[in-house]
Regions:
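Short beta-strand His + acidic residue motifs that chelate non-heme Fe in jelly-roll/DSBH
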Residues: 310-318
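Fe(II)/2-oxoglutarate
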Residues: 1-102
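Conserved short histidine dyad/triad with adjacent acidic residue
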Residues: 215-228, 248, 306-311
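Acidic, His- and aromatic-enriched active-site or binding-groove loops in soluble protein domains
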Residues: 225-242
Length: 344
């Protein structure tokens, strides 16, 4: 495809993307609108991009999973007893695989440029403020808050209750804030994260509408221990990227995480907690004294999967708001349908 987005006005780009989608050229349609929106951010283009990403998954031919996954890799961090760390310039699928397989997570410093992170934070603030002003969770207030509509043929559940639940936890679905999500995807693509994902899974990649979340966490927020495999299943091939958009771990909440691999779901439930949550007693049994609370600078990211034991890491002395984006990505062949897929 040529770079026609550089000469097409937004209306022309939207029209041409429809033609490409109708011809089954989904990647070209997404690329065209991405280039158009780089030139001029527009809410109609951003919203159409999300629709195309969602419809493209529905039209995708059956993705074939890699027979052996994850592939066997050596431990590239044999002396590490905490969370392995690399810089974004060192990011490869083998490094991620090694860290997740042998240590349970990987810290990637400098994943997002701090100046770019500032623009994403701005979009997050606008999105949260617009969502608060909306008459109800499904009322759009462009350009910052545009509730996403899943394809009706997918039999998805994604209405007001799901959004209210996430809001009560200090979050906002990123698909409801297309500009913030667009800026975030652009930032990750700038360091090759999209290519790394394809190499990591060995097949096309999708991210989740329900579990890609903007975080604006106020001081004092609490969240219990959990493994996301309680929602996603243990056989799903997943990778979460948790990106700090402000400093975290000193004056603002971070994450508490077990820096070693667990291959199963641990015992869940207990008095006064959700049936998917893990009690402090159970977490301590598995973690002993190994729990780590990493310190993030703006733009650092933590990678982990659905078996990683973690929670929000917060203390009473933390007085600043935490900004972050959590983005769950999946191998297309094992995508958990109820999470509502969008192609990368």
């Amino acid at each position: 495809m040529n770079n026609s987005a550089s000469v097409l006005d937004p209306a022309g780009a939207l029209s041409r993307s429809d033609e490409l989608a109708a011809a089954g050229l989904w990647d070209d349609a997404i690329r065209l609108l991405t280039e158009a929106n780089r030139n001029e951010e527009r809410s109609d283009v951003e919203r159409r991009l999300l629709k195309l990403r969602h419809l493209a998954f529905a039209e995708m031919k059956d993705s074939v999973p890699v027979p052996v996954w994850p592939k066997p890799v050596p431990d590239y961090f044999p002396q590490e007893t905490s969370i392995p760390e690399i810089h974004a310039s060192e990011l490869t699928a083998d490094i991620v695989n090694s860290a997740i397989t042998h240590h349970g997570s990987l810290m990637v410093r400098g994943m997002v440029d701090p100046n770019v992170a500032e623009g994403i934070r701005e979009a997050i603030d606008h999105a949260f403020d617009s969502a608060a002003e909306a008459e109800n969770p499904l009322t759009p207030l462009p350009p910052w808050y545009l509730p996403f509509r899943a394809h009706r043929k997918g039999d998805y559940s994604f209405g007001g209750p799901e959004r209210t639940y996430v809001r009560e936890g200090g979050g906002l679905h990123a698909v409801d804030a297309p500009r913030a999500l667009f800026r975030h995807i652009e930032a990750l693509s700038a360091v090759g994260f999209d290519r790394m994902l394809r190499d990591y899974f060995g097949e096309p990649v999708a991210f989740s509408a329900k579990k890609t979340t903007l975080r604006r966490t106020e001081p004092g927020a609490l969240a219990g221990w959990h493994q996301d495999g309680a929602f996603l299943g243990t056989e799903t091939r997943s990778l979460n990227i948790w990106t700090a958009l402000s400093p975290c771990g000193v004056d603002a909440a971070s994450l508490d995480i077990l820096p070693r691999r667990i291959d199963t779901l641990v015992e869940m439930g207990g008095p006064d907690i959700f049936d998917w949550a893990i009690s402090n007693e159970t977490a301590e049994k598995y973690a002993a004294k190994d729990i780590v609370r990493p310190v993030f600078e703006t733009g650092d990211a933590l990678l982990f999967d659905q078996l990683t034991l973690h929670r929000t890491g917060v203390d009473s002395h933390m007085t600043k708001t935490r900004y972050a984006i959590e983005m769950w990505c999946f191998a297309a062949s094992t995508y958990p349908h109820e999470q509502i897929p969008l192609c990368w």
